[in-house]
Amino acid sequence: MRDDLMVQQQVETVWQHMVGVICLNCTGRKQVKKVLPILFTVAPTPVHFLNTPANTVKNIIESLGMVNIRYNRLKRMSNDFLTWDGEDATMLHGIGKYGSDSYRLFYKHEVPDNVGDHELKRYVEEEFYDLHPN
């Protein structure tokens, strides 16, 4: 993955976006950018993820820390994703304000109120300045 782009700018699907959000929690983007391509080769979709042995996924994400917690969040989110209506991202397990804001920006092309994350703020300023000036 390119270092000059956000993780969210380099994934192929909404599900992969949500995986990236969970992987970014309590870790650095450089670590995540090394892990995601490997994970998405093994499990490119939620169905593939749910059918991949837990130990395989855990070995891939181990370097991100909190491996059991992170794996359980990914598994529950992937299961939720299969029936999610695509509206409110916080309805997916493990997805909070950051995940919701980034989903709205990158997939719904909406600028959320009170974006808190500094990288998302920078993206809003660069890409949506005319829509939401500071």
Question: Each predicted region: which residue ranges?
Answer:
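C-terminal interaction modules of eukaryotic adaptor/scaffold proteins
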Residues: 114, 133-134
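Catalytic DNA-binding helix-loop module of base-excision-repair DNA glycosylases/AP lyases
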Residues: 16-23, 74-128
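N-terminal polyanion-binding entry modules of DNA glycosylases/AP lyases
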Residues: 1-86, 134
